[in-house]
Design a protein with these regions (language model features):
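N-terminal pre-domain/capping segments
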Residues: 1-112, 139, 146
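Active-site-proximal loop/turn and secondary-structure-junction residues that shape catalytic pockets
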Residues: 9-11, 34-36, 74-77, 118-122, ...
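Acidic/histidine-rich catalytic cores of soluble enzymes
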Residues: 1, 19, 23, 30, ...
Length: 182
């Protein structure tokens, strides 16, 4: 187990200042948050130019004397917009494309893993079918991530397909290579 701090823990500070604050706390590694509604890294910018974003982040992280522990992105705005288990095939394809950019970003920035949100329960589909969509989508994304040498994890949360610890365990067991971020 390693102690990390999220880059968005200091949302009122610029990204570089946030990293310096984390370093001042003697926390050796940062979890990079990339959220459309977040204060620093933006998923769309990573997708547009993963190399440039990785270079910018690497310089800032190195200047602060930190390591990178993980990338924690969202595909859309919040956990309900473009969730991993969307039943819409075109949105799922867009998510896969964005994930591939996240993978390139991580490889270039020296980030060893990506933590994703596990998906939502779709009222029209119910819990079981929503869970199965998450299993299918995450199986594909884990294969992509592992193919690039990255760890892929989920963060269980309320209002998700893995709201209960037993469901989080079931999803991790159902998707070969998937891990759990606490």
């Amino acid at each position: 187990m390693e102690l990390t701090c999220t880059s968005f823990s200091f949302p009122l500070l610029p990204f570089e200042s946030s990293l310096r604050q984390i370093a001042l706390l003697d926390i050796p590694n940062v979890d990079l948050g990339a959220h459309a509604d977040g204060p620093h890294l933006q998923p769309a910018a990573i997708e547009e130019n993963p190399r440039r974003q990785a270079d910018l982040v690497t310089r800032a992280v190195d200047a602060a004397g930190l390591g990178i522990a993980d990338l924690f992105p969202t595909f859309g705005e919040g956990f309900r917009d473009r969730p991993v288990n969307t039943p819409d095939a075109s949105v799922r394809a867009a998510n896969r494309g964005r994930f591939e950019a996240f993978v390139e970003f991580c490889r270039r920035a020296g980030c060893p893993g990506i933590t994703l949100l596990p998906g939502v329960v779709w009222p029209d589909l119910g819990e079981e079918s929503s869970f199965d969509l998450s299993r299918q989508a995450l199986t594909e994304l884990v294969e992509i991530g592992e193919g690039a040498g990255l760890r892929v994890s989920i963060e269980a949360h309320l209002e998700s397909v893995v709201e209960q610890p037993e469901l989080a365990l079931a999803l991790v067991e159902a998707v070969p290579g998937l891990r759990l971020t606490l």
